[in-house]
Amino acid sequence: MSPQTETKASVGFKAGVKDYKLTYYTPDYETKDTDILAAFRVTPQPGVPPEEAGAAVAAESSTGTWTTVWTDGLTSLDRYKGRCYHIETVVGEENQYIAYVAYPLDLFEEGSVTNMFTSIVGNVFGFKALRALRLEDLRIPTSYSKTFQGPPHGIQVERDKLNKYGRPLLGCTIKPKLGLSAKNYGRAVYECLRGGLDFTKDDENVNSQPFMRWRDRFLFCAEALYKAQAETGEIKGHYLNATAGTCEEMMKRAMCARELGVPIVMHDYLTGGFTANTSLAHYCRDNGLLLHIHRAMHAVIDRQKNHGMHFRVLAKALRMSGGDHIHAGTVVGKLEGEREMTLGFVDLLRDDFIEKDRSRGIFFTQDWVSMPGVLPVASGGIHVWHMPALTEIFGDDSVLQFGGGTLGHPWGNAPGAVANRVALEACVQARNEGRDLAREGNEIIREASKWSPELAAACEVWKAIKF
């Protein structure tokens, strides 16, 4: 036990308040392979030294409280306390620092994202000594990640189930998201799938409302995808949203989907909660269902640059909790997403091993070992003119989801789906032939539109759209 980190319990109990940094700021600490490491962006209140602010975060998210308590002497704080082991100034920002905190593995319940977040971010964000606090990244040690099942199936198993290789998968969110009857909803699904899409999708807020109860929607969508499969010879799917007000109701909906023989269900993992999500992911693996994850509510948590939590942390948490797809921004389109940062967390979702790279916002090297990967889903204000950029940015292991970019086609849903499928196949072929999608993308789409009237019509409709 190193002298600078040892907590003296043998000298007798002394009541009162002492500076956190005396116990929790340990710049000489060498991190262990089993530690969970966190990088916090800390903005202290005026007059609060950064060392005290970083130590306060370590204390309040592990063993500490606001005053010395006599029961500290009944345990080994040196074994269980979080430690702020390094602080660096954020370049270009006034009074802002990155505080690195190491947490001993024994602080966390095995296989529980819920417990991990309750400990690390559950209480400390309202701390008075801090003006703002943001969790930028976590390093999940192998010894902890191996206690999680992770995604129900992963990328390779999904491709094998669908028998689709060598290209991104194509999807579409059914619009209008609310108000359609179940039969009309199923008709929209059928038109999109027969036109060439791989998936259609319930919107995140489609659950079981008076205008369309969940069982009716499930039945009509199952009929639609079976009919489209028979016509096209391709395996099709519709993300049936199983999110519900209780875990029991959610599981009932997932069981119904399994009985209908559909390949995939869906969950809103932030509004539904990590406990519910992990339960559903376990059910999906045991019963051969793929699991699509929507990140509704994420911007409430991750959009502010100096407070909250970066989406890369939510992405890592989802991979641990379980999901085969997750929405990950687009870089292009209507929703915010910076290219390098987006690609950083896309790699954290898909790859087995990701090197530390601060230029992409990756603060720690992450080794997922054997945990399956998650397909990133690009959606939000995208259309056929974005296809070359999306194909280049996201690569084959992704889902490109065009809602309005399919259903807004002037000739209807099926021609909209045809336009997207033709554009995608043209981009993949051009890439495989060695053409530069970033430089020649528009020309590739124009060439393809010469032999696809559906694509030509789509190009005309969205030629002036700028997000």
Curated annotation (Swiss-Prot):
UniProt modification remark: The disulfide bond which can form in the large chain dimeric partners within the hexadecamer appears to be associated with oxidative stress and protein turnover.
Propeptide stretches in the record: 1-2
Residues modified as N-acetylproline: P3
Residue positions binding substrate: N123, T173, K177, R295, H327, S379
Localisation: Plastid, Chloroplast
GO cellular component: chloroplast
Descriptive protein name: Ribulose bisphosphate carboxylase large chain
One Gene Ontology term from the biological process aspect of the record: photorespiration
Residue positions, PTM N6,N6,N6-trimethyllysine: K14
